[in-house]
């Protein structure tokens, strides 16, 4: 680990990076080492690429110990800057944090890779003009880019680094200026459109004023020439067809005078008189029509008001009629409901009476059959007991039968009387309900 002031460079695997808890000035970068991403923390504005190389080698030695495979001194290694297929060797004194910030939006496309200086390409892809003019005694194909940069003097190395920074700054300025130009063009376009819209609105207002002036001038000219009522006079003036008719009439009158001068027939004069009378009637009818049309235009407002009053009165009368009809309908509906209830009640009473009638008929039939049997028994027993009957005495058995028969008849009459009373009461109830 290499100390720089109060900060220390620390390296670790990127996927095992803990939560960041460092000062505002500390930064970090990612460096690829043997196909692994190493996170270098604690960078400051004075940290160079050589410091980063030394920190990476020390961390590798601490983790692997004797099994390490990055052998050699820090001067034997270099950091390569890769961007979109292009590569460049960073000099040892390159300020790594400044370079990283200079990339700006292109940082995701840029990578730092740690390689051995001897394993890199013999000729660098990015070379400055000063580097091309250098006449080195050593053979170029025997030197790697890192060794080649090391052979250059420190002044030229600084120039190369400055030139790369200038190029990066220029690229950044070009992108910013392009975006700024696009925004400026949009702003200018909006301002120009707003200006044209204001001009068009102003022109429309001027045209409206000119039209109003022309109409006022035309109105004054007509008033001076034809008077204030020139509109009404224009509608009441005879049309071109009427003028032609008048000319035709004059022409016909001239012809009639000539005919009269030629022939003094009385019949022709009578025909002409009839014709003139017909014409006079037509003209009078047309005049009356025109007068009526003018009067109609004048009286339209009064008629409209009268019609509105009549409509309002008609509406009120219709509303009153509707209310009356609604009340009458409600009364009729209530009366109908009462009648329906009475009908249902009378139907139920009739059904009950029909059932009672059936029961009484069955009882009557049964009693009639029992009476017939009793009469036959009486006859048979009378024949057997002719002797005691001749004495005028009634046997006790016959007295019992007779008493039973009388009781039965009395009971029958009692039942019928009860039913008759029920029927009378029910009839009285029905009559009261109907009233």
From Swiss-Prot:
May play a role in regulating vesicuar trafficking in cells. Its main location: other. It is found in: Endosome. One of its GO terms (cellular component) is recycling endosome. CDD domains: RA_RASSF9. Residues 1-22, 380-435 are annotated as: Disordered. The keyword Ribosomal protein does not apply. It comes from Homo sapiens. SUPFAM superfamilies: Ubiquitin-like. Residues 400-426 have a biased composition (Polar residues). One of its GO terms (biological process) is endosomal transport. This is Ras association domain-containing protein 9. Interacts with PAM. Residues 25-119 form the Ras-associating domain.
